[in-house]
Amino acid sequence: MTEEEKTKSEAEEIEQNNKEEEQEKSVEELLEEKEQEIQQYKDKLQRIHADFENFKKRSIKEKQEFVKFANEGLILKVLEAYEDLERALEVKEDKNLREGVELIYKKLTKILEDEGVEPIETKNQKFDPYKHEALMTEDNDDYENNEIIQDLQKGYTLNSKVIRYSKVKVCKK
């Protein structure tokens, strides 16, 4: 083998090695790109999974809230009868009638309490527009400004949510 052939052969070998290195680099680059792509898909899947879990929790909470207040309309109707019984109890003439009405009143009171219904307190309270509806105002020296003078119609909450505002007379100075 001549010197020229030897040099030519070495040059071909170097060129072949360069091609192999380029192919290795392109395979490595391709592999790295695919690994990055896989990581992006994993991240996306993780976000979607977290979003779905949050959606499930929110749906459960909304369902619980719906169930909690589903009886609101019925309770508002029962409250009217409940208050009629309250007024009937104020009549003290017929003892047997009164005892029967008291029994019904106590049962209704227990039912409403068990369902989460509570009357809104107005005695010695300041007017709160989130709980009370002012139907009348009066300048009265016996009360402070914005203090409730009289409860004209009871208000109620269902599980701490106002379902009927107390209708009140308020002191305004």
From Swiss-Prot:
Q: Which UniProt keywords apply?
A: Chaperone, Cytoplasm, Stress response
According to its UniProt record, where is this protein located? Answer: Cytoplasm
The GO molecular function terms of this record are: adenyl-nucleotide exchange factor activity; protein homodimerization activity; protein-folding chaperone binding; unfolded protein binding
Q: Does the keyword Oxidoreductase apply?
A: no
Cellular component terms (Gene Ontology): cytoplasm
Q: Which GO terms describe its biological process?
A: protein folding
Top-level taxon of the source organism? Archaea
| Main location class | cytoplasm
Q: Where is this region: Disordered?
A: 1-30
InterPro entries reported in the protein's UniProt record: GrpE, GrpE_coiled_coil, GrpE_head
Basic and acidic residues biased stretches: 1-28
Q: Does the keyword Cytoplasm apply?
A: yes
Q: How does it assemble?
A: Homodimer.
Q: What functional role does this protein have?
A: Participates actively in the response to hyperosmotic and heat shock by preventing the aggregation of stress-denatured proteins, in association with DnaK and GrpE. It is the nucleotide exchange factor for DnaK and may function as a thermosensor. Unfolded proteins bind initially to DnaJ; upon interaction with the DnaJ-bound protein, DnaK hydrolyzes its bound ATP, resulting in the formation of a stable complex. GrpE releases ADP from DnaK; ATP binding to DnaK triggers the release of the substrate protein, thus completing the reaction cycle.
Q: Tell me which family the UniProt entry assigns to this protein.
A: Belongs to the GrpE family.
Q: What is this protein called?
A: Protein GrpE
Source organism: Methanosphaera stadtmanae (strain ATCC 43021 / DSM 3091 / JCM 11832 / MCB-3)
**What is the organism lineage in this UniProt record?**
Archaea, Methanobacteriati, Methanobacteriota, Methanomada group, Methanobacteria
